[in-house]
């Protein structure tokens, strides 16, 4: 009887081809069972719907892949009712056991699973037959989180390694030149020009005791150029130390713009001495002078690009901190002045409102019927961060990647293999850091207003929040936040 029933079960599978390569038998935790009826698998993506009141727009966020569930039908069949009951009990105990277990299934193969639910059915007139429906999920293989590189800390460390390598390159490649010759004059002019560029960058940082000290050091260096050009180690140490001093003077906001300016200046100097393929194009007759000047301009450009990449990473850290502070900041309007009577209802037309990008003052009615000025202050946005949206990060990442690629190619063409390797590692870290952490910033969208609206109303219409209306006005170059022109494309940062 048992063999007849098993053959009948397998005959159904054979009609559809399901039993040609499988036996129709399986095990769970080494407890055998027979596979019958349908076997199901389900999966998909974990989507979260974003729907807002009074808005016809919305969307979904993809939170990743769902775990694949497997549901299969099994049975215990035996010619002896007591034996069938014992075998069914053993399978129930295996399904109830804690932890994961090995499932051997003719369709699913051998997989390590955990049981989500199971159901057993039997009939009073068929005590030798037990039908099961079991749902399982794949067990977790990794019991610890994946290790990730702290890119925000790795970028400054790699920047130190790059600048050290650049200093070694300058001191090892530099050749002495004879005093009083045209070659010496050309080299001194090149070094003096580099010092002047650094001095201009420092001069733009303001007037403080630290800035004055660095300016004094640069002036002393400029006065001793004649001796420095024949002391390669001292020259390299002085120039790299000056760049390090500039980096230490800048805060996270001014650092990125400062290194942008320096990189552009050094880029022009480098382009004037080396062609696209690294061919020296200077007009000097001395090969030594040509080589020295080309190496000097390459080292200064590579160092500036290195510090700019480090500044971008630090600016992103500051932007994320700023975003977290703004999320936790109080959002209530603040009264600029005590609530005093400044007029009557009939004199409301004489009151005025002062509008700036940093502050919006509106007239409010006091409890006694007078008027007072209410200020919606842009707390913390007087000095906005360098990066405010994912689009800012994408543009900066592309710019830094292209700039570092150019410097890496120059290093390879001139035979500076150590510099090339260090710069390549820096580029990989910077791009990974900006792309990974930059996703935490808000996204930006482009919209057209149907009509002229105040910035607060326009921002609320597209985001449901008008707290950062000053940012909308600033980033779109709107001089009067009360009048955002309709029909014009504006950038909206949607948090």
Curated annotation (Swiss-Prot):
Residues 444-493 are annotated as: LysM-like. Residues 331-353 are annotated as: Disordered. GO terms for molecular function: DNA binding. The keyword Cell wall biogenesis/degradation does not apply. Transmembrane segments: none annotated. The keyword Transferase does not apply. GO terms for cellular component: host cell cytoplasm; virion component. Residues 339-353 have a biased composition (Low complexity). Residues 407-426 bind DNA. GO terms for biological process: symbiont entry into host cell; symbiont-mediated evasion of DNA end degradation by host; symbiont-mediated suppression of host innate immune response; viral genome circularization; viral tail assembly. Its main location: virion. Induction: Expressed in the late phase of the viral replicative cycle. Expression of late genes is activated by the viral late transcription activator C. Disruption phenotype: No tail is synthesized. Required for tail assembly of phage Mu and responsible for circularizing the viral DNA after it has been ejected into the host cell. Following infection, the circularized DNA can be isolated as a supercoiled, non-covalent protein-DNA complex, in which the protein N is bound to the ends of the DNA. Protects linear double-stranded DNA of viral genome from host exonuclease degradation. LysM-like fold region might interact with peptidoglycan to facilitate DNA ejection. Part of a complex composed of three DNA circularization protein N, three baseplate hub protein gp44 and three sub-complex wedge (made of two copies of each baseplate protein gp46, gp47 and gp48) that forms the baseplate. This is DNA circularization protein N. The lineage of its organism: Viruses, Duplodnaviria, Heunggongvirae, Uroviricota, Caudoviricetes.
């Amino acid at each position: 009887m048992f063999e007849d029933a098993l053959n009948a079960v397998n005959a159904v599978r054979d009609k559809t081809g399901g039993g040609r390569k499988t036996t129709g038998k399986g095990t769970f935790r080494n407890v055998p069972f027979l596979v019958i009826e349908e076997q199901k698998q389900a999966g998909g993506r974990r989507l979260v719907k974003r729907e807002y009141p009074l808005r016809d727009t919305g969307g979904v966020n993809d939170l990743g892949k769902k775990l694949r569930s497997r549901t299969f039908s099994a049975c215990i069949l035996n010619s002896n009712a007591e034996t069938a009951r014992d075998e069914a009990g053993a399978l129930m105990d295996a399904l109830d056991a804690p932890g994961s277990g090995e499932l051997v299934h003719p369709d699913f193969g051998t997989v390590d699973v955990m049981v989500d639910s199971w159901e057993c059915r039997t009939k009073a007139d068929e005590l030798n037959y037990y039908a099961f429906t079991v749902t399982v999920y794949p067990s977790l293989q990794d019991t610890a989180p994946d290790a990730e590189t702290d890119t925000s800390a790795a970028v400054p460390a790699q920047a130190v390694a790059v600048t050290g390598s650049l200093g070694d390159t300058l001191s090892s490649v530099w050749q002495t030149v004879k005093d009083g010759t045209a070659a010496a004059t050309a080299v001194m002019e090149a070094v003096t020009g580099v010092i002047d560029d650094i001095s201009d960058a420092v001069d733009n940082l303001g007037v403080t005791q630290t800035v004055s000290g660095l300016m004094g050091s640069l002036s002393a260096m400029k006065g001793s150029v004649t001796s420095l050009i024949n002391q390669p180690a001292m020259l390299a140490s002085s120039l790299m130390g000056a760049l390090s001093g500039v980096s230490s003077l800048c805060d996270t906001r001014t650092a990125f713009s400062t290194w942008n300016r320096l990189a552009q200046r050094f880029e022009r100097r480098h382009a004037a001495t080396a062609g696209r393929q690294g061919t020296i194009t200077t007009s000097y007759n001395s090969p030594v002078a040509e080589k020295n000047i080309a190496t000097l301009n390459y080292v200064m450009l590579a160092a500036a690009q290195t510090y700019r990449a480090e500044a971008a990473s630090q600016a992103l850290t500051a932007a994320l901190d700023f975003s977290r502070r703004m999320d936790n900041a109080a959002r209530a309007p603040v009264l600029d002045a005590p609530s005093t009577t400044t007029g009557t209802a009939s004199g409301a037309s004489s009151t005025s409102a002062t509008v700036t990008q940093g502050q919006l003052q509106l007239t409010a009615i006091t409890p006694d019927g007078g008027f007072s000025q209410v200020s919606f202050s842009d707390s913390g946005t007087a000095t906005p961060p360098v990066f405010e949206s994912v689009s800012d990060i994408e543009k900066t990442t592309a710019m830094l990647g292209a700039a570092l690629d150019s410097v890496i190619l120059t290093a390879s063409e001139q035979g500076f293999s150590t510099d090339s390797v260090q710069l390549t590692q820096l580029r990989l870290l910077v791009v990974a850091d900006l792309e990974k952490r930059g996703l935490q910033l808000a996204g930006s969208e482009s919209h057209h207003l149907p009509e002229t609206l105040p910035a607060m109303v326009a921002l609320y219409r597209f985001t449901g929040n008008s707290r950062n209306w000053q940012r909308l006005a600033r980033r779109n170059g709107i001089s009067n936040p009360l009048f955002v022109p309709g029909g014009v494309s504006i950038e909206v940062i949607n948090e």
